[in-house]
């Protein structure tokens, strides 16, 4: 459960991300594909080369979904219901991949926001991404 401090930390950090949400989302995806090559199997139709327009477009989708989640931290299940259905029933993404992408997002944010990425902010973002991952995998049960 996200505390009021966690929510405040997440909102403040996400405000710093601002218009870079798509760029950071794409960078996190690239990190994931490089660090965890098995994740590429979900994207056989993508050009996974650095700077690929398909990775950039999907990175923007990831970033926009997280922006939506940040705006609805009190109702993540409601805000992410359609996305949860998509990943569970249509795409059948292995739940572990959400943890891998979350890790890559944290690394990306730490890289771009070094002065703002305090231990407290890191912990809050980690809890937030874990909550998002839990919601996205809730329909698997």
UniProtKB/Swiss-Prot annotation:
GO cellular component: blood microparticle; haptoglobin-hemoglobin complex; hemoglobin complex
Modified residues (Phosphoserine): 3, 35, 102, 124, 131, 138
Binding site for heme b: 87
Phosphothreonine: residues bearing it: 108, 134, 137
KW Transport (keyword) present: yes
Gene3D superfamilies, alphabetized: Globins
Protein residues bound to O2: 58
GO BP annotations, alphabetical order: hydrogen peroxide catabolic process
GO molecular function, one term: iron ion binding
Keywords: Acetylation, Heme, Iron, Metal-binding, Oxygen transport, Phosphoprotein, Transport
Phosphotyrosine modified-residue sites: 24
Positions of modified residues (N6-succinyllysine): 7, 11, 16, 40
Tissue expression profile of the protein: Red blood cells.
Superkingdom: Eukaryota
Residues modified to N6-acetyllysine: 16
Domain Globin: 1-141
Family (UniProt): Belongs to the globin family.
Function: Involved in oxygen transport from the lung to the various peripheral tissues.
SUBUNIT field: Heterotetramer of two alpha chains and two beta chains.
Protein name: Hemoglobin subunit alpha
Lineage of the species this protein comes from: Eukaryota, Metazoa, Chordata, Craniata, Vertebrata
């Amino acid at each position: 459960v996200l505390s009021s401090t966690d929510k405040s930390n997440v909102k403040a950090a996400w405000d710093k991300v601002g218009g870079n949400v798509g760029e950071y989302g794409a960078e996190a995806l690239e990190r994931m594909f490089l660090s965890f090559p098995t994740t590429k199997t979900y994207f056989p139709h993508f050009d996974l080369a650095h700077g690929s327009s398909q990775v950039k477009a999907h990175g923007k989708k990831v970033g926009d979904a997280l922006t939506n989640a940040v705006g609805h931290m009190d109702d993540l299940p409601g805000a992410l219901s359609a996305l949860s259905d998509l990943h569970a029933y249509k795409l059948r993404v292995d739940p572990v991949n959400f943890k891998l992408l979350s890790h890559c997002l944290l690394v990306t944010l730490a890289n771009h926001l070094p002065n703002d990425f305090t231990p407290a902010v890191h912990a809050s973002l980690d809890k937030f991404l874990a909550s998002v991952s839990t919601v996205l995998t809730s329909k698997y049960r």
